[in-house]
A protein has these predicted regions:
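Conserved catalytic-core motifs of GNAT/GCN5-like acyltransferases
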Residues: 59, 105-108, 125-142
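Terminal substrate-recognition subdomain of acyl/acetyltransferases
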Residues: 139-154
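Glycine-rich acetyl-CoA-binding "A-motif" of GNAT/NAT acetyltransferases
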Residues: 50-53, 114, 141
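Conserved acetyl-CoA-binding loop-helix of GNAT-fold acetyltransferases
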Residues: 80-95, 116-121
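A short beta-loop-alpha structural element at the N-terminal edge
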Residues: 1-11
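Conserved GNAT acetyl-CoA-binding A-motif
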Residues: 97-107
Length: 154
C-alpha cells in the first residue's frame, strides 16, 4: 500500500457494505497505514492492476503465543468472486511459511455469512462467538465470530 492508494481505499471503505463493518473512512488513518506508522502491516489488494481492497495483519511476537491476525475489506463490486478467499489464503501462507506463525486468527461479524464462508474456504475454522464484541458505527454492539487456522492445517 502506498500513499497513492489512499483515495481509492477511502472510496472503497466508504461504500455502504464496507463502511457497515469498517466504519467511515478516515483519511489520516489510511495515510498512517500507507506510511507504515500503523501497528498493522498493510497491503493494497489489486485485481487486473486496479486497487480493489486492503488486507492487513498484526503480529504477536512473543514466542509463547506466536500468532497473527488478519483483516480485509474488498470493494463491493468484486465481492463474491473468490478474491477474498484467495487473498486471505495467500496472506495465511505468507504468515505461516515466511513469518513463522503457529496460529492465525480472523474475527468477522457473526452475522457476516459471506465473509465467514470465504474464510472457511481459506481453511479457517470457527472457534467461538465473542458476545457484544464490537460496536458498529451506529453505536450498537454486535457479536464477532473468532476463527483460527493452525500452521499444520494449511
Amino acid at each position: 500500500m502506498t500513499a497513492d492508494d489512499v483515495p481509492r481505499l477511502a472510496a472503497i471503505q466508504g461504500q455502504p457494505g464496507v463502511a457497515a463493518a469498517w466504519g467511515e473512512p478516515e483519511l489520516e488513518k489510511l495515510a498512517g497505514k500507507a506510511a507504515g506508522t500503523d501497528e498493522c502491516t498493510v497491503f493494497a489488494v489489486e485485481l487486473e492492476g486496479e486497487v480493489v481492497g486492503l488486507v492487513q495483519y498484526h503480529e504477536e511476537d512473543d514466542p509463547m503465543y506466536r500468532h497473527a491476525g488478519i483483516d480485509i475489506f474488498l470493494s463491493e463490486d468484486v465481492q463474491g468472486r473468490g478474491l477474498g478467499t484467495e487473498t486471505v489464503r495467500t496472506m495465511a501462507e505468507y504468515l505461516i511459511r515466511e513469518r513463522g506463525h503457529h496460529r492465525l486468527v480472523i474475527d468477522p461479524a457473526a452475522h457476516n455469512t459471506a465473509a465467514i464462508r470465504a474464510y472457511e474456504k481459506a481453511g479457517f475454522k470457527p472457534v467461538g462467538v465473542m458476545r457484544q464484541y464490537e460496536r458498529l458505527p451506529g453505536g450498537e454492539w454486535h457479536d464477532g465470530l473468532l476463527m483460527d487456522l493452525l500452521a499444520d492445517e494449511l
